[in-house]
Amino acid sequence: MPKMKTKSGAAKRFLKTANGIKHKHAFKSHILTKMSTKRKRQLRGSSLLHPSDVAKVERMLRLR
């Protein structure tokens, strides 16, 4: 039986760490002039994935 392939789109977007799965925030690529400075500041950096989404992403990354 062949090896299971990782979803390459998911591999580019998520990173497995000791504390969980890390991801970048959405809505931060273009047309940012209408967004407030506070909102853009809150979307900076990365955060951990919500526990309800972890199983789906682990399946895409073939961690499970």
UniProtKB/Swiss-Prot annotation:
Question: Known Gene3D superfamilies for this protein?
Answer: 4.10.410.60
Signal peptide boundaries: none
The regions listed as transmembrane in this protein's record are none
* GO CC annotations, alphabetized: cytosolic large ribosomal subunit
**Short name of any one Pfam family annotated for the protein:** Ribosomal_L35p
One MF term in the entry's GO annotations: structural constituent of ribosome
Q: Report keywords, A-Z.
A: Ribonucleoprotein, Ribosomal protein
Return one Gene Ontology term, BP aspect.
translation
Is Secreted given among the entry's keywords? no
The record, for InterPro entries, names:
Ribosomal_bL35, Ribosomal_bL35-like, Ribosomal_bL35_CS, Ribosomal_bL35_sf
Keyword Ribosomal protein on entry: yes
Family, per entry: Belongs to the bacterial ribosomal protein bL35 family.
What name has this protein been given in UniProt? Large ribosomal subunit protein bL35
Which organism is the protein's source? Pseudomonas syringae pv. tomato (strain ATCC BAA-871 / DC3000)
